[in-house]
Amino acid sequence: MEITKNLPYMEMTRNLPYGYAIPTVSDLLMAKPTADVQITLAIIHTFIWFYLINKIFVPIIFWIYHNMKSKQRFLYFNRRLFKKAIGWDIGGDENEQKLAIARIDAAMVQHLVGAMLCFPSGFGFGHFLPAGVATAMACQANLCELGWEIEDTLMRIYEIIFGGERGRKFNPPSLMLTLIAHHTAAWCMAIPINMYYPNCTLQHEGLCILQFGVALNFLCQKYGFTLDVANKRDLIKMKILCTIVFVTVIWTRLFRYTYIGITMLVMAYTDENFLLFKLMLVPTIFLSLFNVIVVKDATKKFLKFWSMDTGTTPKLQRQNTRLLSKIYDMKGSVDHNEVRPLYPEIGSVMDVSKTNSETSFKSG
């Protein structure tokens, strides 16, 4: 692992505020480890990701969710997830549900981009590229994450202040606190890491596995929300998804994360870089607490679905019945083919109707 310690503490602000020098294109592309270049790149990434997330990725994801065959099941489980995880009810309006989910999921595209930028340096493929390019890509990945987090925070604050009731509904305190806890990592570490340790391949690996891991886990989770685990084929798919998530989480959020986090803290402390040590300590603690929750949830789901059998337990039928009833309460109806029946032999179409406060099911 090659590490270059470039600058003393005062170098972080050597050009600011009155001595700011306009960086060259070459300096920007190579993410030169100086304050003027790093701050300029952070601003550039903020504008880039504001446009990409809100003008391109969110509309595309919204369209995908709007045209899903299992849309109602998908929206129901997403709504339940948000309420359970952070106490946020995204409401009963279908369009607002899809928009709220799409705004969160669009960030996974940024995570994938960041992971790809970090991969060559983090996993030893930098020698296949021209000198310095792999390091520059990884530094851009740090700033890519920082830029998204800046635009996300500023946009949500703007919506809370000027967006009226709808803006506050999309950005409740519980969500904002969760995002702030997440965003502290890039806020505190992105620019200092790029300036003090731009060649630290271990940090590049850590960012890569965290961003790729969370994107992969989100994808598996979202696909899992479309499955009916009472169906044998769907249950097999769910077991595979839970295994992928479990293995990914254990490696990226427990074993490798712990090693990289401790090594980075020891490195900064040994170098007597106490400013960076303090900046790294707070987000490391926040992420560690978050990782405990993620590992616990992944383990619980892994054990739950691998011990589950299809079509044999009354509990599954009761769960499916409650799901259909809740969807009926929210929508007033259940569209054909959007929620499949518990047992395949019943048929492929199920209607839900309310009679005398009881739910009756009719096969089509």
For each predicted feature, which ranges?
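Juxtamembrane membrane-interface segments at transmembrane alpha-helix termini
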Residues: 216-226
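Generic alpha-helical transmembrane segments
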Residues: 206-218
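Membrane-helix and juxtamembrane interface regions of eukaryotic multi-pass membrane proteins
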Residues: 2-209, 230-340, 361-364
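Intrinsically disordered, low-complexity serine/threonine-rich segments
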Residues: 341, 348-363
